[in-house]
A protein has these predicted regions:
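His/acidic metal-ligating clusters that form di-metal
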Residues: 71-150, 187
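Active-site-proximal beta-strand elements of phosphoester/diester hydrolases
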Residues: 55-65, 94-96, 149-155, 190-192
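Binuclear metal-dependent phosphoesterase catalytic core
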Residues: 123-125, 142-203
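Core catalytic region of metal-dependent phosphoesterases/phosphodiesterases
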Residues: 1-39, 122, 126
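Catalytic metal-binding/acid-base residues of hydrolase active sites
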Residues: 25-27, 64, 100, 137-139, ...
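Divalent metal-coordination and catalytic microenvironments
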Residues: 7, 23, 61, 81, ...
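A short acidic, helix-capping loop that chelates divalent metal ions and anchors anionic groups
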Residues: 29, 67-70, 103-107, 162
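Alpha-helical scaffolding within the catalytic cores
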Residues: 35-49, 138
Length: 203
């Protein structure tokens, strides 16, 4: 709870527009308790979000599997995305999820990736309005593609992992985050990093 409370304190200026999805290190029940005014539902129900902005339908997907490092997206979740797209007049759709829905050419990271990614891939192929998928999990910046959707991962706010690695390997790098600007004409995105690494690394 202390970590979530600290994050809530840091993000206080943005609480009225804060949306969250859990990652593999998270606890849904605790996350709900600390962010009770931003997350509906109870206990271990999925934590997802849905809003529209600047002609974009923005959907947050919960890929967390309690007790596991790998993630999962279910057929029911994919059906929900499909249904929501059918009712939305937005010209574009962005998905936000912890586990990337593509392989990253990293043996160990791909082994703890997303189960069910083929279901999402089929939907993206059928629905070109899905143009952006933003993820975390991999602790480094990655650019990929799933049908017409650009897949973008984000550096860790802590330690960084080497890309294209067969085994886990820490690399020097400043903690970072991704800024995404959605506009009626598309989107822009960039990585911002703090000036000094905050965590020493040892492999």
């Amino acid at each position: 709870p202390e970590s979530y409370t600290a994050v809530r304190s840091l993000l206080t200026p943005w609480l009225d527009r804060l949306w969250q999805v859990p990652g593999n290190h998270d606890d849904r029940a605790v996350l709900r308790t600390v962010f009770h005014d931003r997350i509906s539902g109870t206990a271990d129900q999925l934590i997802q979000f849905d809003f529209e902005s600047a002609g974009w339908l923005c959907l947050g997907l919960d890929t967390h599997v309690p007790g596991a490092v790998a993630g999962r997206i279910s057929a029911a979740q994919v059906d929900q995305i499909r249904s929501r797209l059918q009712t939305s007049s937005a010209s574009r759709c962005a998905l936000f999820m912890h586990h990337p829905p593509v392989l990253l050419n990293s043996v160990w990271m791909d082994a703890i990736g997303l189960a069910g990614r083929e279901l999402l891939g089929a939907l993206c192929t059928a629905e070109p309005r899905i143009q952006l998928i933003c993820c975390g999990h991999v602790h480094h910046e990655f650019h990929g593609q799933l049908a017409t959707a650009a897949v973008r991962t984000t550096p860790s706010t802590g330690i960084q992992f080497a890309p294209d690695s067969d085994t886990p390997k820490f690399v020097p790098g400043c903690p970072g985050f991704r800024i995404i600007d959605l506009t009626p004409g598309g989107y822009t995105t960039e990585i911002q990093r703090i000036s000094t690494p905050s965590i020493p690394i040892t492999n």
